[in-house]
């Protein structure tokens, strides 16, 4: 009887958009786990392949939540110099440390990542090989920093006139152009992974005023949220399982947009009714997500996969090794920055 009352109370409540901000760090933790699941190796012949590939949506969740965070950051201090400094200090020192370790090691061993000293400097400082050739080792960080650069101008634009939120359509049209117009495809297709993620980042910025205003969706929105989560998820999963390699991957990123928005709203509501300890675990993962992202794949997971262990065993080992290292890197960077700022 009490379970029935709780269920009725939940379904009769409006859907609170504000919960996205309240549980932003926890959602970052969930997104990080999805990315780790995505990076684990499963052969394309496996029944689990398509589902595993859905972990890629974790990147879109990161960008969506980053857009929200940047809007609130700009609102608290609308100063370009302060904004860029805060964003730079949040990402760049960690990136510089780990990129130097990775590319320096491979340059020393002539592993093929950097051809000469200038190439090495370009990779370490700005991951130039991503922008020039589509080298994806740590693509997310330079892509994120590029979005940081444009975000204050977009925020001011949409704050001035909400009609500019329609600009989120432009990257989608641009992806179609780059996919099928030959000169653009030849010159810019290597950046598809970036172009196709711009829209979800801008949508995060667009939604932020509604979070601030504590907007709510009516209770009967819930079935629609589940439809908008499950329908594109099933389609994307099918495409990855049965059609992977036969269509431009940006199609999947377009499907990730409704999956991300509806999924984040559903997950936010679930977190509201989740055990405190579980929430703390997700928040902890979210608090070291930058370090985990940079460490888990090329430093830990790739070497582990050479041992051909079970998929889930490999991922558990990867997390068991990556989490303490991520905490250590975070401590080193924080300690260094504190001493520099003295």
Predicted stretch roles:
Residues 23, 56-60, 133-145, 190-205, ...:
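Membrane-interface micro-motifs in multi-pass membrane enzymes
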Residues 37-45, 173-187, 232-245, 298-300:
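C-terminal ends of transmembrane alpha-helices
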Residues 145, 296-297:
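Transmembrane helices and adjacent periplasmic/lumenal helix-loop junctions
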Residues 12-16, 189-202, 209-291, 298-318:
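Alpha-helical transmembrane segments and terminal signal-anchor/GPI-anchor hydrophobic tails
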Residues 163-210:
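Loop-centered beta-sheet repeat module
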Residues 1-176, 219-227, 276-278, 283-291, ...:
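Membrane-cytosol interface segments of multi-pass membrane proteins
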Residues 66-76, 206, 263-269:
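Canonical alpha-helical transmembrane segments
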